[in-house]
Amino acid sequence: MTNEKVYEMKSSKVYPLLVNKALRKNRTKAEVDEIITWLTGYSQPELEELAESEISYGDFFRNAPELNENRTLIKGVVCGIRVENIEEPLMREIRYLDKLVDELAKGKTMGKILRKN
């Protein structure tokens, strides 16, 4: 899938996929929401509104109130690519979220996922 196709996807379509990935591994929607708010700076009410809106996934990240400065500590592979090596900034932000949800699904603690240690 090209970057542009990812950017044009509706957040209302992507958000349930992220939540379902966590739920399948006995994690919660609240944990996914905590990860998203930590990464993007959106408040919980803003996130809930955006999750049901027609905003594109690209604009969801472009308009993020405050991307967490510790997001650069996120390392590892998602979709076969090291997130820290992704050169296109918007795609890197999107893959950071993918990586964090992957870590949640793999059973990591929220403290480790949110780089609190």
Report the location of each language-model feature:
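A charge-rich, low-complexity, intrinsically flexible signal that marks solvent-exposed coils, linkers
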Residues: 1-117
